[in-house]
């Protein structure tokens, strides 16, 4: 099958990639955003991982069709400003082997003329939840993912916030509990929220993954304290209409009520916010890939 992108006498499709630190999700969608097929596979080294994504699109595009646009939501930090020379590159990431990786070239080499739009994975997830998820009909909200790392996307007045780079919410410093002697998982900052409350931090601190820790484990008291502190900071600085907490760690159903209660205690109900102010995603694990499709549209 030819990989050259042409539109004459061909049906056109959109491509989407959610590139996380541990797994990659790829999808092919109609121009209206309906997903036709998708797959997931582990994040390995850049060359083999990106080539596997290229092969997915080459193998699964319908016959006599073309891929005209690709949206990529990637772990970061990443170059997301098209005006800068580092657009589409992974920057100072702790993910071994990925610093300097170019996310654009493997796809433009395989599909000449392909339009590619790149943003962070959390910004893509924020877009997805805004379309038909937990932030539908809202114009200002924050999406936080708590997985291997921690990141956040901020939407204010229906616009994703970007500046010099993109928000690095995972590297906000928080107060470390006196009882917590853990030195932190982040190689850059000892007491940032990613260093103290990410999935990697849970594993390093307790020797088990989050999904293997029972609800009564002391990890959750500490985890909810740190995440409630983060929500308090975001509320004070951004005043969003809602905070959405996603990612693998938040799939533990007992965690959200703990965070909500600790947030109320810490804030002393100062903001008088609705009960659904802090919630989990409505799109579940599909938030990011749906947002990546939106990037391609």
Which residues does each predicted region cover?
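ATP-binding/phosphotransfer module of carbohydrate and carboxylate kinases, centering on a glycine-rich
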Residues: 1-69, 78-87, 104-114, 128-140, ...
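Short beta-strand segments
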Residues: 18, 71-75, 119, 143-149, ...
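Short beta-strand scaffold segments in enzyme catalytic cores
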Residues: 24-28, 150-155
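A charged helix-plus-loop insertion that forms the helical arch/lid used to bind
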Residues: 84-99
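Active-site nucleophile and cofactor-binding loops and adjacent substrate-binding regions
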Residues: 93-97, 117-123, 143-146, 279-286
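Adenylate-forming
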Residues: 125-131, 152-154, 173
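Mobile, glycine-enriched helix-loop/loop "lid" segments at the mouths of ligand-binding/catalytic clefts
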Residues: 163, 167-179
């Amino acid at each position: 099958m030819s990989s050259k992108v042409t539109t004459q006498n061909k049906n056109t499709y959109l491509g989407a990639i959610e590139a996380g630190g541990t797994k990659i999700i790829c999808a092919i969608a109609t121009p209206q955003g309906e997903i036709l097929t998708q797959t997931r596979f582990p994040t390995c080294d850049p060359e083999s991982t990106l080539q596997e994504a290229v092969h997915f699109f080459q193998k699964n595009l319908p016959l006599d069709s073309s891929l005209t646009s690709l949206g990529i939501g990637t772990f970061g930090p990443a170059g997301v400003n098209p005006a800068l020379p580092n657009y589409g590159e992974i920057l100072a990431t702790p993910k071994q082997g990925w610093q300097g990786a170019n996310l654009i070239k493997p796809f433009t080499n395989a599909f000449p003329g392909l339009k590619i739009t790149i943003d962070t994975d959390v910004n893509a997830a924020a877009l997805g939840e805004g379309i038909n998820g937990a932030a539908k009909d809202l114009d200002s909200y924050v999406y936080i993912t708590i997985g291997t790392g921690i990141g956040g996307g901020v939407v204010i007045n229906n616009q994703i916030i970007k500046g010099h780079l993109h928000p690095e919410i995972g590297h906000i410093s928080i107060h470390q509990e006196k009882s917590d002697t853990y030195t932190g998982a982040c190689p850059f900052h000892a007491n940032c929220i990613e260093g103290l409350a990410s999935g990697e931090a849970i594993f390093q601190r307790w020797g088990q993954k989050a999904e293997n820790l029972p609800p009564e484990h002391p990890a959750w008291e500490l985890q909810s304290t740190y995440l409630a502190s983060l929500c308090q900071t975001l509320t004070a600085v951004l005043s969003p209409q809602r905070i959405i907490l996603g990612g693998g760690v938040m799939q533990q159903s007992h965690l959200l009520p703990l965070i909500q209660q600790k947030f109320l205690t810490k804030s002393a109900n100062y903001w008088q916010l609705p009960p659904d102010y802090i919630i989990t995603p409505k799109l579940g694990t599909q938030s990011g890939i749906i947002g990546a499709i939106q990037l391609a549209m």
